[in-house]
UniProtKB/Swiss-Prot annotation:
Its main location: mitochondrion. This is ATP synthase F(0) complex subunit 8. The lineage of its organism: Eukaryota, Metazoa, Chordata, Craniata, Vertebrata. The keyword Nucleotidyltransferase does not apply. GO terms for biological process: proton motive force-driven ATP synthesis. The modification N6-acetyllysine is found at residues 54, 57. Subunit 8, of the mitochondrial membrane ATP synthase complex (F(1)F(0) ATP synthase or Complex V) that produces ATP from ADP in the presence of a proton gradient across the membrane which is generated by electron transport complexes of the respiratory chain. ATP synthase complex consist of a soluble F(1) head domain - the catalytic core - and a membrane F(1) domain - the membrane proton channel. These two domains are linked by a central stalk rotating inside the F(1) region and a stationary peripheral stalk. Belongs to the ATPase protein 8 family. GO terms for cellular component: mitochondrial membrane; proton-transporting ATP synthase complex. Component of the ATP synthase complex composed at least of ATP5F1A/subunit alpha, ATP5F1B/subunit beta, ATP5MC1/subunit c (homooctomer), MT-ATP6/subunit a, MT-ATP8/subunit 8, ATP5ME/subunit e, ATP5MF/subunit f, ATP5MG/subunit g, ATP5MK/subunit k, ATP5MJ/subunit j, ATP5F1C/subunit gamma, ATP5F1D/subunit delta, ATP5F1E/subunit epsilon, ATP5PF/subunit F6, ATP5PB/subunit b, ATP5PD/subunit d, ATP5PO/subunit OSCP. The keyword Acetylation applies. Disulfide bonds: none annotated.
Amino acid sequence: MPQLDTSTWFITITSMIMTLFILFQLKISNYSYPASPESIELKTQKHSTPWEMKWTKIYLPLLLPPR
């Protein structure tokens, strides 16, 4: 059975890691980040739900004083 030649593994793995690093750096460099995220105000939207339109009273019989 022939012996496995591992002499080229180091250069192959090293070049693969370097290539992946460069590709990820190029991918990340295309994103544009805001200069100061604290200065941006987010507008909150009020969602209308059907139970907000109605007046409801919750009775808690266990908390009512005895008559």
